């Protein structure tokens, strides 16, 4: 076991790896009386085309298979479910699927060993029968239908369909109803066998526990299991072209106040910074111009033009996106104001220093939240493939010249606006 020392913030992450390739990341917090475990698989909803070594053709599975597999994986060979086992322990469990990965989680106060062993066991022991699959289809189809009636869901995927031409983020994580109905046991087994391998998974444990004991439990558990050789599947992604699918889209939804999402898409090659650093700078720039303490937000609220406004960014593959989210009764007035602001983003030296101090304070304080830090570790592993041990240094070295360089290179030529309006 080795330690990943997080420089400047007096924290460390313990790291080990099992003989079968399963990595273990642990952060101990003796100030709490609980623990949070997540077992993640680097397989998400966009991974619908893949091939393994020696294969000439890509395998294509239905959209939503990652999410479907997450659902049925709670079934146990004895006819029970993982929920029943953890309920008896007094533990809380859940799972979720994103575009990029699938995560199974356990939150508990006691019975550390039993919780850890069974998390590993139920996730790594598939039990798929035609009857269980057919039963689950009805449940997931209802989930799909409910999601499509959710205003936030409509706005998010409406924008994805407007902004992206080829990227699979256009598609629902759940898949459409037709995808769910068409999913087969063979597909689920194929995905499980290909991706649910220790070398393609990682375990993160945060909270109050003994890391040496945890590693011993995991290694003993994994030593009892036999896994076939990892086939290192290659995922197929279509290169996302510039330009947008639709510049303007209006969608009716169950809302009282219209919601707006203005999004911009640009190539990452515009920026001469790595993904992690670019993400930090964009976050600071957007918060300064559209965040809770921004002048624009205060002005729009004071004039009662908006109920709320905020911004976020995303970086994947070689694409950078920026989203401005607005809730307003006056979209025709507010949209031009926001677009004009995007042309005139500002960040001065004092703003940057203040936000650096805020980020460093958050970096330190966030380690008290075992769920947050667990999620952050997982996100770093999925997004960057490693854990940065120098975030304090990165924040400390941010400078106004680099920030303004990034502002100057933001390309607004590929933009979509999606407006969510009340049903007529």
Residue ranges and their predicted role:
Residues 145-149, 153, 243-257, 361-377, ...:
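Short, low-order "capping/linker" segments at domain edges
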Residues 393-411:
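Internal helix-turn-beta structural module
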